[in-house]
């Protein structure tokens, strides 16, 4: 496949590659790691991936999710501000959509404390994690049979699982904006200052909406800033 064909067929994959280049190329960001995982069969086959999700897991994901397809087994970055006084830190580890559904079960690690929570955890599949910092924060899609547009949940071991006010495509688009700043997901959850999960991250999130727009002025951060104000 030519570079042009790759860009046209898998546009979100190209945007992820661009995100890693942005992080590596900025003098005010100290990058600990950026990594594109392998492209492996059969995960590289767009048609077969979504056909098998329907056949084996009854997950007929809709076109907006399919448009965010990327072939890499995982896409990862870990970084921090180059300013030693800064609390701005980021990490993400995105998993291929098929691997997320098949391998990354929240219930493998967290059982839940009651029947409702156990049912929820049994359906959550992790697609974004923080393995390098070990922060215990991750995002998961709810693999309810028959869904075309799965719920997205943020799991923080300090606060449990919180449903997010966005869908899978919007999550992936917002990740590009935030660069994976630790805790950005709280801006789309019913949580705020005083909550055990949000409060320790408030200063870093405040710095995110103040500093990152100056580092990457080509993007619009107005909604993120507004959401943070609502939670402070």
Place the predicted regions along the sequence by residue.
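A surface-exposed partner-binding patch
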Residues: 1-134, 230-232
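Alpha-helix initiation and N-capping motif
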Residues: 13-16, 43, 165-169, 181, ...
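Acidic, metal/cofactor-coordinating or nucleic-acid-engaging core segments within structured domains
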Residues: 119, 133, 178-185, 189-190
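Hydrophobic beta-strand residues in large extracellular and virion-surface proteins
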Residues: 127, 139-141, 152
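Aromatic/basic-lined ligand-recognition segments
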Residues: 130-136, 212, 216
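Broad, structure-driven detector of short, well-ordered beta-strand segments within folded domains
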Residues: 134-145
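Compact, glycine/acidic-enriched structural inserts
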Residues: 150-186
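Charge-dense, low-complexity intrinsically disordered regions
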Residues: 185, 191-232
């Amino acid at each position: 496949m030519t570079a042009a064909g790759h860009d046209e067929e898998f546009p979100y994959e190209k945007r992820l590659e661009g995100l890693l280049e942005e992080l590596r190329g900025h003098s005010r960001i100290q990058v600990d790691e950026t990594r594109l995982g392998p492209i492996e069969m059969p995960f590289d086959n767009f048609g077969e991936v979504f056909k098998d999700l329907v056949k084996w897991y009854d997950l007929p994901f809709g076109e907006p999710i399919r448009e965010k397809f990327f072939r890499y087994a995982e896409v990862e970055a870990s970084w921090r501000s180059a300013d030693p006084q800064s609390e701005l830190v980021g990490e993400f580890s995105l998993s291929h959509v098929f691997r997320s559904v098949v391998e990354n079960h929240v219930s493998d690690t967290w059982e839940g404390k009651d029947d409702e929570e156990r049912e929820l955890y049994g359906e959550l599949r992790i697609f974004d994690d923080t393995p390098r910092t070990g922060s215990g924060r991750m995002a998961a899609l709810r693999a309810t049979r028959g869904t075309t547009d799965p719920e997205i949940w943020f799991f923080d071991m300090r606060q449990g699982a919180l449903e997010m006010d966005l869908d899978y495509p919007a999550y992936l688009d917002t990740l590009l904006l935030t660069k994976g700043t630790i805790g950005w997901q709280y801006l789309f959850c019913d949580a705020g200052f005083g909550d055990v999960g949000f409060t320790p991250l408030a200063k870093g999130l405040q710095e995110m909406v103040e500093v990152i727009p100056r580092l990457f002025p080509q993007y619009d951060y107005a909604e993120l800033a507004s959401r943070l104000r609502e939670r402070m």
